[in-house]
Amino acid sequence: MWLLQHRAAALFLFAVSFLMPVSHAHSREKTDIKTLVIVSHPYPERSVLTKGLQAAAESLEGVTVRNLETLYGYDTRQINGDAERKMMREHSRVVFIFPTHWFNITPMMKAWLNETWGSVGPGLWQGKEMLIVSTAAGGSATYGPDGRIGVSLADVFLPMKACALHAGMAWLPPLVFEGARSDRLPSYQHQLIERLKQ
């Protein structure tokens, strides 16, 4: 019985992550701002929401998507800081898509920032924009003034805000999905596409 349930769950995850298309109503749309999307998930084989959000971003013209685990695996020493800085210079907005991982960004995303921004002085990315897009399993029972940890999910991203402001970037209000569930993926994709088109 357990094996059948496990296989059914695996088939469902496959169908949701690989077969669920982004709505045709959104295809061929474009963003007016040249956008670099950095995607990371610590367990890509289990990713449903992050893969779905990546697919939504890829459906827009004017968006360049870089999945860190696809490019570099888990070897942080392989991150090419020079190439990543070149990508940053070629875009006006950077978007980070990731699941909230222990109240933080993912390990590969942190390594990417260290390699790419490690020598960034104040104002180096002046005039560019930063947007955080994140999913979190926890909802109001975890986040917010009455939640278990007593801080909002947006507060978890204050270090990223500090990075953006230090580098001279405009900090955009994060797009965060609390209590995230795979059956809500089409809504999350739609919200992301609408934000990227702004």
What role is predicted for each listed range?
Residues 14-122, 193-197:
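N-terminal beta1-alpha1-beta2 submodule of the flavodoxin-like/Rossmannoid cofactor-binding fold
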Residues 129-172:
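Short, glycine-/small-residue-rich phosphate/pyrophosphate-handling segment
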Residues 101-102, 137-139, 180:
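Solvent-exposed loop/turn segments at secondary-structure junctions
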